[in-house]
Amino acid sequence: IHSKKIMNGYTVENIAIESFPGFYITGNLYRPLEEQKKYAAILSPHGHLKDKRFTDYVQLRSAFLANKGAIVFAYDMVGYGESTQVRHKMPISMLLQTWNSKRVLDYLLSLPEVDQNRIGMTGGSGGGTQTFVLTAIDQRIKVSIPVVQVSAHFFGGCVCESGMPVHKAENFQTNNVEFAALAAPRPQLIISDGDDWTRNTPNVEYPYLQKVYASFGVSNQLENVHLANEKHNYGYSKRKAAYAFFIKHLKLDSSKALNVIDTDENFIQILSPERLRVFNKKTPRPINALNNELEVMQFLKFPTHKSPYNYYKN
């Protein structure tokens, strides 16, 4: 962890943690500048776009939430940004991404200043998949916001989302709505739009999830913000809804954020990719790093001659 930058109400550091021996998760750690006894923590994965960790909207949501009292870890999707030890579309990318998210969670919970009862996660598109998958299998995620991804009819357009496969096999079939339902009874906000596979959310996916939450007696823990005139992104109106939900359920500093839903992001300075990179000439990738996906597969004892769809049959 290095290159601490003091910003307006928050700090940004460049960080790499070891997911397993020789495989590194690269990201940025956003912290509140104001000292507190305990902080909420938020995992911030992203979707499919080159260098997306460096984009304005990932920086904006991470910095805003840090300014309001959360430690936020924004990290690269496997095969994107600085995570170049393997291709993204490799057979076990879903496994690697899920494991990476668990390791990010492990790291955040290892910080003595983090409140283990106030852990959130949010991402858009492929980051939304990472959000509802980890929330489904790890009860340590207390509040989740999958954005523009929960769909009853679309598994995800990439091997990292549906390639294992986890949705359909010889003896079962499921979908992402049932995965999202596994968040119950924990607070969950589903954000959807009118221009992608989440267009039916108010009439299809959300009513199903409402029934699941009602069966736990916690209907008030589930919300849907549907933006019918918007497209597939994690834009300002979606971030605004996410901010309010996290502030409410993670008990962030509402005095700074909920004055007439004051979610102004103008205080945030967007940093260049060069200032956010973990590995450079001064801080190169460690010498024990696995160099390619063959080395990764061999280290994890996966056979390298099988089709990706045959890895998980036995």
Locate predicted features.
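Generic beta-strand/beta-sheet core signal
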Residues: Y30, P45, Y75, T122-G124, ...
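Cap/lid segment of the alpha/beta-hydrolase catalytic domain
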Residues: L33-E113, V150-P165
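Loop/turn elements at helix/coil->beta-strand transitions in domains of secreted/extracellular proteins
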Residues: K38-A40, K68-I71, D115-R118, Q139-V143, ...
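Primarily recognizes the serine-hydrolase "nucleophile elbow" in alpha/beta-hydrolase
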Residues: D106-F172
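Short beta-strand-to-loop junctions in surface cap/lid or active-site-entrance loops
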Residues: A16-F20, G27-K38
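Alpha-helix capping and helix-loop boundary segments enriched in small/acidic/polar residues
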Residues: L49-L60, H88-W99, M121-F132, G163-E178, ...
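The feature captures the conserved acid-bearing segment of alpha/beta-hydrolase catalytic domains
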Residues: V143, F155-A214
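Alpha/beta-hydrolase-fold serine-hydrolase catalytic core, especially in secreted/extracellular enzymes
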Residues: I1-Y24, A184, I191-N314
